[in-house]
């Protein structure tokens, strides 16, 4: 495989994993206040994504892939909300272990990574087009 095609393939895998990362972040943000339905029930637990590399045997390039989708085993936060159906006898409710500020920072990083991979694909496409134009002009 030529180097430009390899670069596009690698960047394409980067787009895929960053899309997954953005989906997970959006799920976490959307569920940041999702409690259990009954007293003592666990609320939404923050999801995580882990990346890994994988050799593409056809092209010979190392691509990035989603290695594992998991959950954050961190502690839940307890809030006083006696009117909540999930409140215990003391009025305390288990709240998700999602920190929206951390999720927003993760979202920005994923967006930047996605944009960088997209730029690699655009640059590669432009280089291929320039090469084709150069070859046409020399005939």
Swiss-Prot record:
Its main location: other. It comes from the Bacteria. Signal peptide: none annotated. It is found in: Bacterial flagellum basal body. It holds the Pfam family Flg_bbr_C. GO terms for cellular component: bacterial-type flagellum basal body; bacterial-type flagellum basal body, rod. Keywords: Bacterial flagellum. GO terms for biological process: bacterial-type flagellum-dependent swarming motility. Belongs to the flagella basal body rod proteins family. The basal body constitutes a major portion of the flagellar organelle and consists of four rings (L,P,S, and M) mounted on a central rod. The rod consists of about 26 subunits of FlgG in the distal portion, and FlgB, FlgC and FlgF are thought to build up the proximal portion of the rod with about 6 subunits each. This is Flagellar basal-body rod protein FlgC.
